[in-house]
């Protein structure tokens, strides 16, 4: 998994949120993450993984928010999945803005090449090509507050049936590495309602963790 983050003004992010959420700031900025990764062993609890359904690339555009109770979490501006059924399931089951896309992840040594071309359920032609080179592991003593702000989130917010909802996200802390962006050509942020980002992005990479997303609850 690769985390690619940019600063945005809080007002720009707040304009894209429902009224019951507030853009969370760090160092005076709201933050948006572009996160391409490979989903593996995806399954409903108590059921077996299916080779043709349980492994697929995904790329998310997300931001960081608080609700009226002060609970921190994620708000997704878009989620692209390389399989149609998970995209439909994410929309129907969680109210998340999933899109079905033509996607791939290529691994060559310390290089990761992510490709995404949106097919259906959304603006045609939206894309993301990202080439990333992994660096040294990030030691626990090198993790700062911003790193945890951007990567350690244990709740997602959504709207189900017109009502505010949330789901708990369980995982151990991400084992992180430094990363360098070799190439990026994307318009997923624009398709999600954002202007083009300014400045160099902040990158982290991870070998991944096992994640469990609970059922949604009305907030």
Regions from the language model: what does each represent?
Residues 1, 60-219:
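Internal, well-folded beta-alpha domain core
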Residues 1, 7-8, 12:
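A compositional/structural signature for long, glycine/proline-rich flexible linkers
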Residues 1-2, 21:
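Active-site acidic/histidine clusters and adjacent loop/turn architecture
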Residues 3-5, 26-27, 211:
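Terminal catalytic/cofactor-binding subdomain
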Residues 7-8, 46-49, 88-89, 194-196:
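Short secondary-structure boundary micro-motifs
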Residues 10-59:
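Glycine/small-residue-rich interface belts in oligomeric ring/scaffold proteins
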């Amino acid at each position: 998994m690769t985390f690619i983050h940019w600063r945005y003004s809080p007002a720009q992010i707040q304009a894209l949120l429902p009224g019951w959420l507030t853009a969370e700031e760090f160092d005076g900025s709201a933050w948006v993450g572009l996160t391409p990764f490979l989903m593996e062993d995806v399954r409903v609890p108590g059921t077996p993984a299916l080779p043709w359904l349980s492994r697929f690339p995904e790329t998310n555009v997300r931001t960081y928010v608080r609700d009226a109770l002060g609970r921190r979490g994620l708000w997704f501006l878009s989620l692209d999945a390389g399989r149609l059924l998970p995209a439909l399931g994410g929309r129907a089951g969680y109210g998340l803005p999933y899109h079905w896309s033509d996607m791939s992840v290529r691994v060559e040594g310390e290089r990761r090449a992510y490709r995404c071309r949106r097919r259906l359920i959304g603006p045609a032609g939206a894309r993301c090509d990202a080439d990333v080179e992994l660096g040294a592991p990030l030691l626990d003593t090198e993790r700062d507050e911003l790193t945890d702000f951007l990567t350690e989130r244990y709740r997602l917010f959504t709207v189900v049936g017109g009502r505010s909802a949330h789901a708990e996200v369980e995982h151990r802390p991400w084992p992180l590495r430094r990363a360098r962006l070799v190439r990026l050509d994307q318009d997923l942020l624009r398709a999600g309602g954002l202007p083009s980002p300014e400045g160099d992005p902040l990158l982290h990479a991870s070998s991944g963790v096992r994640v469990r997303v609970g059922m949604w609850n009305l907030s």
